[in-house]
Swiss-Prot record:
Protein name in UniProt: Atos homolog protein B
Biased composition (Pro residues): 227-238
Transactivation domain 1 (TAD1): annotated segments: 436-444
Keyword Nucleus: yes
Subcellular location(s) of the protein: Nucleus
Domain notes: The protein contains a transactivation domain (TAD) which may be required for transcriptional activation of a subset of target genes.
Coiled-coil positions: none
Organism: Mus musculus
Main subcellular localisation: nucleus
Domain of life: Eukaryota
Amino acid sequence: MRHVQAELSPSSEPEAGPSQPPVRQGTLQGGLLMGYSPAGGATSPGVYQVSIFSPSAGASEPPRALKRPAPPTEGPRELKRGPGLGAREGLPPEEPSTVGLLSPEGLGLGLGVASQHFSHHGLCVVEHGGNTTSPWTSGTQSTPWLSSNASFNTLHTRDWAFPDQGGQGCLGETPGPAPSGQLHTLDTDLHNLAQIGGKSPVARVGNGSNPWPRESHGTANGHSPEHTPPGPGPPGPCPTKRRLLPAGETLDVSSEDEGPAPRRRRGTLGCPLAANSSDAKATPFWSHLLPGPKEPVLDPTDCSPMGRRLKGARRLKLSSLRTLRKGPGLLSPPSASPFPTPAVSRTLLGNFEESLLRGRFAPSGHIEGFTAEIGASGSYCPQHVTLPVTVTFFDVSEQNAPAPFLGVVDLTPLGRKGYSVPKVGTIQVTLFNPNQTVVKMFLVTFDFSDMPAAHMTFLRHRLFLVPVGEEGNASPTHRLLCYLLHLRFRSSRSGRLSLHGDIRLLFSRRSLELDTGLPYELQAVTEAPHNPRYSPLP
């Protein structure tokens, strides 16, 4: 590395020629030490190192100006191209040379420390302000020392780019004669980095914004933030802060630290977009938050008395139709009772018997504990089974007249085929009360040998009390119904006969007491459908 050291001379006249500065003993005086290292050869970028020495703040020696003779007469100095720039444009690459030039303002400001080191790798510092005449180009005496608060605009550029000023192009073009203030490749206003007062390391350019965060000169490694060679971002640990340009202002292309700010969409809300969407397929979990259907517009005729009467009549008609279709028994939940309850409708059938069997009376209560034992005999004897019986009683009169009980035996626990019986034989059904006492034993004889496959039919077995001697001639008005057993039969596709569905029973809760002294006896009557006798399965 080659060094060029400049110190303040006690004489006010410039020296006759370039000479080595004397080495002073004792206190170090103010001066400037410049050096250049080719690093990797002529083709690799060099490193410029500038050391500014200044007396301490308490030094009593007044500041002195430095004068140097003008360099030999030469043409207008062109801006130095960076290594590799000429090769890209078809020009031969230039040899890097040791260039360390001072402006007269470089030594005019005292620093608060003994020395400051500035190392620039591929960095070009160009002066934008301060229209002063350089003593090296004009040969005149340098200007007096400026005050410490004097500010000069400096521009740091990377990749050897140069801003367009006064119609000049970039360094890639052939530059014309540059102003005297721009002939220096190193502006000595770099010492403004160490100034106290919160000034930016790079002077404000154009709009006066500060692209780098302010940082103290005492860093962790004891060097200035500018000691680190410039990289893709600004020097220092802080990331680059981009600014947003106001409307109507264009971006300053001369600043490398401020890139194009991202555009912010106006009118966007902080809430997510999906909150304003109505796509129920994409976001089904918030569909309940959507507004419900609009209320129907009221017809003006509904406010009139006639409209209200018509509306009420229509509601009553719809309610009655629903009641007839479903039945009152279906309106209650099925879990309200542990046993099945026949559907009840207010519409009665032709006689009292049919109305009870089909559940057209509303039940007054239920009795639990009844059981029924079912058996059959014939060509074979199936195993007897015992099933619970659901018993329901009714209140059908106001004179406390006896009303029969309705018992329902559900055959569903036996399976889909029901209880298998022979085609010709006898069925025995024994009813037990909660005390396991026999209430009634029913014996029914049947013959369904001519029943085709996949058909169904039923048998209704009744027990009447009739006067003795009138068994065959007893009128229906003289018969009293005591017990009833209703059985349903079905033949499978293979021809097997079985009981299916349920078994319904009617029985009295106490013995019938007759007022007359005529003797009565029980008469059994078994009936089956006649036309047709068998019906095909649905």
